[in-house]
């Protein structure tokens, strides 16, 4: 069974994106996390076995110190 994936876009306090990327990468379920130039500050690819697990991963990320806003987009398989 394929995992459910989503992109999570984070806005952070400045300075801080590089420090926060390091912390985001430690969260189980994070596939990739990258700092960006411009807004949003960070883009994260996350995955879980189902939407509930995906929600848990996203909640752990957005609760990290320095994250001020987030937007999540579940990937639609075609």
Residue ranges and their predicted role:
Residues 1-78:
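A compositional/biophysical signature of low hydrophobicity enriched in polar/charged and small residues
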């Amino acid at each position: 069974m394929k995992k459910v994936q989503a992109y999570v876009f984070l806005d952070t306090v400045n300075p801080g994106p590089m420090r926060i990327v390091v912390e985001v990468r430690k969260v189980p379920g994070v596939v990739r996390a990258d700092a960006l130039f411009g807004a949003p500050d960070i883009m994260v690819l996350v995955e879980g076995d189902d939407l509930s697990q995906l929600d848990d991963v996203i909640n752990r990320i957005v609760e990290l110190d320095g994250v001020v806003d987030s937007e999540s987009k579940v990937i639609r398989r075609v």
